[in-house]
């Protein structure tokens, strides 16, 4: 019996157990720990489901006679390396009715051993060759200012399939505060998002002590609230908003009081009173109690996130932040008080500590802050740049060795399952698991985290790296991220979800607005805490010196040491 060496096997079928894969040009490697696509034992080798001329998936060979009515999947992605919060495995991934049905071995049970019963390939099954590729869940951007519709193509081209945030366009309120305020604006934005192949979670304005004004927004389609200092994040407003959120079962996102006008970080934590809350840009450059908002990452009830302009700490990070602040918060550089406000938020010591807290799993999520001090197309990229910098600085995480699976699982969770859990979306999205919407991203390993090869929305290709449409084959230059058939209006709506509060469902919102996109309620998140955020549950002791702004984590002071060079940068981008 002839045997294949590892190199030859990988070239035919993709890497298998024990093989390591470099992520883009970083120092990070993942190792395949299980291969479900091979079949039972070593005898399964050579019996993998592979598509192409003279290959396996042909009539009466790897393709069975099973009809769709008999359970054949609509799509199988063959031999992909799945990177998710729960592990790194190789599998064939089956999709039916837009949802993942199984991860295992696909093929024809009449001719092949070990075929998963939900992965029986039939004449109605499409194939995507995932062999040699990396597959992740679609990214969830947990901090989106909906300033312009052009953000959506940028997001999709970077592998983002879910947007959490708010806005109405380039209004001053939207440019600063991530809020879609009031029932009229919510109806307009829900209608506007109906045409795009993304899931949407709109946040209403929580800065009020009037309960009915918040319930009105919940009935109108808000799936949570945003508390923002530009609208006045006082202890009274925090308490009132959380009281309504507790009753409604929705999440609250917090941008606290940078100027400490209505209280200090201790007063905000007292107003939160142990209740679940999502703390945006926890480091503070994006806003929040100066200089010590970062200490909230130690609280078990606080679900902390970062926004991407401070990820990771580089020699250019501080310089770009001042101008961003002046624009985004409608400040005047000629007014000394406005300038002091901006400068108070930019601290190298807390930005440096943010790197460490991410690597510890103490800051659990990363979002963009799109066009409002953040870049929607760089959520995934900057997450992995941070992981690379931390490996170089801190070495392997516990459990890692030649490969970095523990670190990779922690960092992929920051933009997939963790924001999904935080906002009550995880029953539908956020991971590569059976039953969930097939929002999936396929990467060539050399471009991992930089540019996807394919972005699937609800099991249908919505975006892809595609060459000249007038060429004789799909690959001639220029190869650009382009919309595919899944981005057309009909499949875009059918393949996506609009998340709203349970109160909106009870009030008849889906029927009232007549949206084409399926409308589903968020899960109750009020009893969720950091312990529920996979791979990102740490609650270290965090202290900030009020005079020097030095941050100590579990008693150890963090020294600012910004990096001068990053991977996933000039090798891939001209600008």
UniProtKB/Swiss-Prot annotation:
Catalytic activity: urea + 2 H2O + H(+) = hydrogencarbonate + 2 NH4(+)
Cited CDD domains: Urease_alpha
Keyword Hydrolase applies: yes
EC numbers: 3.5.1.5
Family: Belongs to the metallo-dependent hydrolases superfamily. Urease alpha subunit family.
Pathway the protein contributes to: Nitrogen metabolism; urea degradation; CO(2) and NH(3) from urea (urease route): step 1/1
Name recorded for this polypeptide: Urease subunit alpha
Active site location: 329 (proton donor)
PANTHER family on file: UREASE
The keyword Hydrolase is assigned to this record: yes
Biological-process GO terms, alphabetical: urea catabolic process
Location of the protein in the cell: Cytoplasm
Binding site for Ni(2+) 1: 143, 145, 226, 369
UniProt GO molecular function: nickel cation binding; urease activity
Gene Ontology cellular-component terms listed: cytoplasm
Binding positions (Ni(2+) 2): 226, 255, 281
Enzyme class, first EC level, given as a word: hydrolase
Cofactor note: Binds 2 nickel ions per subunit.
Modifications after synthesis and translation: Carboxylation allows a single lysine to coordinate two nickel ions.
């Amino acid at each position: 019996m002839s045997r294949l060496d590892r190199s030859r096997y990988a070239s035919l079928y993709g890497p298998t157990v024990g093989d390591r894969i470099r992520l883009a040009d970083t120092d990070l490697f993942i190792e395949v720990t299980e291969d479900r696509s091979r079949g039972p034992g070593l005898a399964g080798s050579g019996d993998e489901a592979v598509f192409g001329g003279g290959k396996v998936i042909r009539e009466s060979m790897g393709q069975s006679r099973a009809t769709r009515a008999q359970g054949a999947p609509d799509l199988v992605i063959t031999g992909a390396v799945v990177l998710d919060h729960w592990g790194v495995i190789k599998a064939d991934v089956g999709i039916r009715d837009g949802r993942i049905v199984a991860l295992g071995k696909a093929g024809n049970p009449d001719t092949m051993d070990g075929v998963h019963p939900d992965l029986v390939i039939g004449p109605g099954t499409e194939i995507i060759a995932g062999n040699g590729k990396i597959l992740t869940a679609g990214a969830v951007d947990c901090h989106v200012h909906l300033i312009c519709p052009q953000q959506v193509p940028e997001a999709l081209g970077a592998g983002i399939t879910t947007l959490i945030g708010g806005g109405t366009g380039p209004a001053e309120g939207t440019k600063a505060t991530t809020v879609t305020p009031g029932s009229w604006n919510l109806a307009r934005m829900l209608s506007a998002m109906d045409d795009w192949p993304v899931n949407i979670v709109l946040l209403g304005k929580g800065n009020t002590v009037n309960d009915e004004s918040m319930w009105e927004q919940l009935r109108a389609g808000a799936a949570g609230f945003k508390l923002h200092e530009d609208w006045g994040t006082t202890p009274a407003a925090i308490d009132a908003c959380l009281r309504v959120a507790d009753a409604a079962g929705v999440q609250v996102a917090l941008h606290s009081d940078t100027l400490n006008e209505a209280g200090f970080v201790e007063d905000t934590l007292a107003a939160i009173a142990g209740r679940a809350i999502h703390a945006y840009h926890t480091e503070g450059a994006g806003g929040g109690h100066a200089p010590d908002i970062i200490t909230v990452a130690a609280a078990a009830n606080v679900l902390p996130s970062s926004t991407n302009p401070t990820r990771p700490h580089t020699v250019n990070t501080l310089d770009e932040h001042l101008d961003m602040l002046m624009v985004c918060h409608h400040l005047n550089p000629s007014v000394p008080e406005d300038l002091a406000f901006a400068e108070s938020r930019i601290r190298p010591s807390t930005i440096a500590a943010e790197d460490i807290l991410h690597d510890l799993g103490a800051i659990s999520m990363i979002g963009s802050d799109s066009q409002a001090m953040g870049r929607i197309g760089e959520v995934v990229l900057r997450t992995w740049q941070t992981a690379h910098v931390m490996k170089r600085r801190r070495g392997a995480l516990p459990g890692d060795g030649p490969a970095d699976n523990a670190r990779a699982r922690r960092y992929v969770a920051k933009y997939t399952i963790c924001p999904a859990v935080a906002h009550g979306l995880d029953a539908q999205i956020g991971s590569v698991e059976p039953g969930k919407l097939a929002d999936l991203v396929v990467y060539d390993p050399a471009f991992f985290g930089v540019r996807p090869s394919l972005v699937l929305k609800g099991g249908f290709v919505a975006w892809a790296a595609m060459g000249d449409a007038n060429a004789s084959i799909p690959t001639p230059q220029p190869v650009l991220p382009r919309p595919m058939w899944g981005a057309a209006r009909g499949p875009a709506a059918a393949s996506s979800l609009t998340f709203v509060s349970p109160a909106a469902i009870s009030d008849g919102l889906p029927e009232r607005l007549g949206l084409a996109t399926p409308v589903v309620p968020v899960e109750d998140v009020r009893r969720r805490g950091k312990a529920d955020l996979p791979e990102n549950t740490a609650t270290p002791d965090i202290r900030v010196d009020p005079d020097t702004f030095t941050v100590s984590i579990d008693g150890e002071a963090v020294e600012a040491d910004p990096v001068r060079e990053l991977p996933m940068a000039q090798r891939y981008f001209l600008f």
